[in-house]
Amino acid sequence: MIKLQTVENADHVAQARALFQEYAETRKHDPAVENFQEEIDNLPGKYAAPDGNLILAYSDGKLAGCVAVHKLADGVCEMKRLYVSPRFRGRGIGRHLVEAILKQAAMMGYSRLRLDSIPSMKEAQALYESIGFYEIPAYRHNPNEGTKYYEIELHNKSMNLMLRKRDLTT
């Protein structure tokens, strides 16, 4: 069973920090995460309410993944740090996390959500496209050549219906 939890206390922050550290280990040679330790040390940082959110996922009670969102501009937010531990992949946890953060972002008043995805993240890109994200021109610098930039409109009626339907089944 998959359970999602918004980061609300020091224990949750410590769990998020552990997942962020695990995520950083998978991207040791990625120039986009060179100053990542500062972000880890300052959690929840830019992902704190009211402009941000950080969600943890548990599979059968075990910490499995996370996702975060923060404000980019009025009405626009950015999804970051979607990560599922390798031992929990293939169970739909990433999809649950993305759909939950989309719903949270819409409830926070954002109308669009953006993200960037490096070339090696093919599975994540397929997930984003299956949910309804579309490619856009670069909106920020990412030092990884071939990075794709995506956006989704959060007040899309079909997306809202999809999220409501999934709420009934999770």
Enumerate the predicted regions with their spans.
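C-terminal "cap" of GNAT-fold acetyltransferases
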Residues: K3, S111-R114, I118-I131, E135-T170
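Loop/helix-junction capping segments adjacent to catalytic residues or to phosphate/diphosphate-binding pockets
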Residues: A10-A14, R91, K122
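Active-site acidic-Proline motif in GNAT/NAT acetyltransferases
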Residues: S85-R91, P119-S120
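Hydrophobic alpha-helical segments, especially transmembrane helices
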Residues: R81-L82, G90, L115, A126
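Conserved G/P- and acidic residue-centered "switch" motifs that form tight phosphate/ATP-binding loops
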Residues: G61, G92, G109
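Acetyl-CoA-dependent GNAT
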Residues: V7-K80, S85-P86, V98-A100, Q104, ...
